[in-house]
Amino acid sequence: MNLHEYQAKQLFARYGLPAPVGYACTTPREAEEAASKIGAGPWVVKCQVHAGGRGKAGGVKVVNSKEDIRAFAENWLGKRLVTYQTDANGQPVNQILVEAATDIGKELYLGAVVDRSSRRVVFMASTEGGVEIEKVAEETPHLIHKVALDPLTGPMPYQGRELAFKLGLEGKLVQQFTKIFMGLATIFLERDLALIEINPLVITKQGDLICLDGKLGADGNALFRQPDLREMRDQSQEDPREAQAAQWELNYVALDGNIGCMVNGAGLAMGTMDIVKLHGGEPANFLDVGGGATKERVTEAFKIILSDDNVKAVLVNIFGGIVRCDLIADGIIGAVEEVGVNVPVVVRLEGNNAELGAKKLADSGLNIIAAKSLTDAAQQVVAAVEGK
């Protein structure tokens, strides 16, 4: 679950981290009033969406008058911002962040993620702030400096100083950087985050460090013990199908193709998408129904898949381990009847009672094609989409 920039900075303030004074506004009038609270300009106005690349898309602007603030708010509030990280529809702009402009001397980068290979929280710092860290990692990886947190001791001040020295910081900036490092690490651990990022972390012309931007990603599996973060969730920034799937504990990710995929198991789901692609098809989604492929869950999965108007056929790939394939077939038949599926459905069943399950599908009289193998299933669903 991602947070908006203004929400990230609210958390920074709670932990004593330096950030520009700013206010999130939902109307042009609130935006003008925010400028008055902040004081004399210039100000920076920023569209609040869960996507990067806002500046290049016109969603971030430095303004010198309240009239310009009102014009910016009127132009963006209620609209959708399209960036290189969004789809063609963009993300809705419901809030504008108005904050004091900062005299930027130098831009740095500081962030942390959970590194699966080392099984540690790893902090990354770079002198190349203000650009995508992925681009820096690809083109100049030697400019990224890392430290890993020991799960027994947690963050240590010497690690912050180590990063500061590698960034070439001196004097009071080392102390300020170490404080920010310790604060971010505390937020990361106490709030069950999966990602935290300040890009850029700015050295002002006055010689101080300030968190000019903030990006936080919470671990969705830990939200049950983070009520404050749950309240910050903005579902308007999420795909409605993904939100609906989450309510049924279905793992769904929308894609750009026209072949809906329903699979039990994340690895099998990825393999299914690969083989569909291999045979010339384009997956419309990733959908893992998990181990409990009941009629209710399968029905809901069909509803979610078919809510995408681009879907021209559905491939169901189920491995019956704990759950018997004949029971899964009953669920698929019931779901197809209830939902009223009007596109071809190709089903591949493997495992416990697979033959009985395939027979039930064949005898159902519905527009369900029982495949003999995964390759056969991929070929048949691609052919169905192509009208062959």
Curated annotation (Swiss-Prot):
Instruction: State the encoding gene.
Output: sucC
Q: Please provide one cellular component term from the Gene Ontology annotations of this protein.
A: succinate-CoA ligase complex
Q: What is this protein called?
A: Succinate--CoA ligase [ADP-forming] subunit beta
Q: Which InterPro entries match?
A: ATP-grasp (IPR011761), ATP-grasp_succ-CoA_synth-type (IPR013650), ATP_grasp_subdomain_1 (IPR013815), Succ-CoA_synthase_bsu_CS (IPR017866), SUCC_ACL_C (IPR005811), Succ_CoA_ligase-like_bsu (IPR005809), Succinyl-CoA_synth-like (IPR016102)
Organism name: Salmonella arizonae (strain ATCC BAA-731 / CDC346-86 / RSK2980)
Class of this enzyme: ligase
Domain ATP-grasp: where? Answer: 9-244
The record lists the catalysed reaction(s) as: succinate + ATP + CoA = succinyl-CoA + ADP + phosphate; GTP + succinate + CoA = succinyl-CoA + GDP + phosphate
Pathway in which the depicted protein is active:
Carbohydrate metabolism; tricarboxylic acid cycle; succinate from succinyl-CoA (ligase route): step 1/1
From the record, give the cysteines joined by S-S bonds: none
Q: How does it assemble?
A: Heterotetramer of two alpha and two beta subunits.
- Which HAMAP family does the record associate with it? Succ_CoA_beta
| Enzyme Commission number(s) of this protein | 6.2.1.5
**One GO MF term:** succinate-CoA ligase (GDP-forming) activity
Where does this protein hold Mg(2+)?
Answer: N199, D213
Q: Briefly, what is this protein's role?
A: Succinyl-CoA synthetase functions in the citric acid cycle (TCA), coupling the hydrolysis of succinyl-CoA to the synthesis of either ATP or GTP and thus represents the only step of substrate-level phosphorylation in the TCA. The beta subunit provides nucleotide specificity of the enzyme and binds the substrate succinate, while the binding sites for coenzyme A and phosphate are found in the alpha subunit.
